[in-house]
């Protein structure tokens, strides 16, 4: 069942041929996140990071969640095309999804504003994690949400700077 967020639905009803600036599209693609399925053993994460490092591809963001037998490493990399090709060649089990990456100039106040905007738009955050780099000198957070288009539109409308894959590629 498809769901349209409350704010995006009301914005769509009010839209005319003159689109407001807040509905503009991001320059460049959204950010690709790789979910890598790893055995829960010592050194498994190191193997993946070394595989990328040898190919001069940098881990830009990382989050790991574990269970008894396995772990899922969520990775944002500097060159997603190379990563996808490499994972396929080396038979690394993975999935790909899109995340919204938001720059936070003042984390203490902006994080509350960001989450409140998503709640008002009825956008669910599945998980979030910080970037390891500061692409433009500020903190940034990756958000896996149930509606990337609505989240992007709402956050841009609230004045947040969204980062594209081009912004984080080194």
Summary of predicted features, one role per range:
Residues 2-5, 9-170:
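A conserved regulatory-domain signal marking ACT and ACT-like small-molecule sensing domains
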